[in-house]
Amino acid sequence: MPLGKYYCDYCEKQFQDTPAARKRHLDGAQHHRARALWYDAVRRQELHGGGGGAPPLLHQPGAAAIGVCQHFVRTGTCKFGDSCRYFHPKPPPANPGPAPSGPVSGPMAQQSNIQGSQPNFVGYQAADGSSFSGNILGGHTSWGNLPPSLRPPPEGGYPPFPFVDWG
C-alpha cells in the first residue's frame, strides 16, 4: 500500500507522509520561518485593516518588521519602499466623519450616565464630540460589518416569505 503525500501550506512543500518525515519537517528551521511569516502577515492585516504594509515575502526570510520606520514617520517617505524592514504606519484619516450633533440616546448612553463611566466595548467613544464605530444619523446606528444574524431586526419587521411547497 503506497504511502500518502503530505503538503505543507506554510512552506509549499510536499513529501512522503510518515511520522518521522512529518516531525522532521515540522521541527525544521525553514518551517518555523515560513510559519512565522504567515502569522506575521495575518497579524499585520488585522492591525491595518487588511492589506496595509508590505507583503511578507518582500522581506528577507525571518526578518519581520522590527519597530517603526522613524524616517517614514518624520518625512512620509522611505527610500526602501515596500522592502523596508521597518513598519510604515498609515496616517490617520484627515476627516474622520461627522460627529453626532446632540446627546446620544439609547441603552449604551443610559448605561454610561448611570455608571458615570464609559461602557467597555470596542469602537465606543464618549458623546462629547466623538462618535461610535457606526455613523449615527437620525437616531439610528449603522451596524457596520456585523453579519445579518447579529443585526437587530428592521423596524417594520421582516417581509413575509413566499409559500414554497416542499411536497
Swiss-Prot record:
Q: Which GO terms describe its cellular component?
A: U12-type spliceosomal complex
InterPro entries listed in its UniProt record: Matrin/U1-like-C_Znf_C2H2, U1-CZ_Znf_C2H2, Znf_C2H2_sf, Znf_CCCH, Znf_CCCH_sf
Keyword annotations: DNA-binding, Metal-binding, Zinc, Zinc-finger
Looking at the keywords, is Lipid biosynthesis present?
Answer: no
A GO MF label: DNA binding
Bias (Polar residues) ranges: 108-120
Cysteine pairings via disulfide bonds: none
Zinc finger (C3H1-type) locations?
63-91
Source organism superkingdom: Eukaryota
Indicate, by first and last residue, each region the UniProt record lists as having compositional bias (Pro residues): 89-101, 149-167
Q: Where is this region: Disordered?
A: 89-167
- This chain belongs to which protein, by name? Zinc finger CCCH domain-containing protein 3
